[in-house]
């Protein structure tokens, strides 16, 4: 079925700390699909049990964070027999758990920053990154370079509801590679005007400079694209993802995480990478629908 003949439910909002960003992603996707002639309905998800409108052919998932991105929603939709965009329940759950994802990617030979589960007794000397095991949009992330910063981070982590992890700090360029279908999009470099690429810098206009394609040798760009595809496949991801990297001054890159429902706002990285590859936002959304529908019908990516 062509996207123009589908009835699409754009699911956004959700119950996580990323609700506002999810709403912005959903609104942007809905606007883009509408401009391409797709029949759609926007669904503001407000609980951990979604109600899909009658007659829906496929759900376009824009739910970032817990419930929408951790495999729970995907499992519910599988039970309903409802088609949806992106990775399945198992891959979504795996990618959302950063420690489990590290284990799998490490076993696949993918370069990673060293990381372990964090407790107050299981601590390192600075520098390091302290962050939630399962969260997105850099919520709850602390960069620790001094003992004073470490104490502040420990206090904040003690108030966080979920498990935390500690990771070696890699100083260098912040990079990302989007995957759509089987294609790795051009590398994007993000350069925040202050600090690192945290929640404020991600979603505040003018706070970050985006370089796409990133200024690097062609061979290095191809290397990162191949690493991104390898990470995507190692976790069993399908249709789309965004793989985040850090690269030091010597050109050594490590994978930080794989995002199975990347942001789709006007400031988001996947749409920017699509533009650099000659894919405008409307056609990017259509591709995601087409690939997801084919997967649902055939069990494979067409």
Regions found by a protein language model. Give the residues of each.
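Active-site "cap" helix and flanking loop/linker of ATP-utilizing ligase/carboxylase catalytic domains
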Residues: 189-241, 272-302
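Glycine-rich phosphate/pyrophosphate-binding beta-alpha loops
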Residues: 65, 138, 193, 259-273
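Conserved metal-phosphate-binding beta-hairpin within the catalytic cores
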Residues: 168, 232-264, 274
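A glycine- and small-aliphatic-rich helix-loop capping segment at beta-alpha/alpha-beta transitions
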Residues: 75-84, 146-151, 276-277
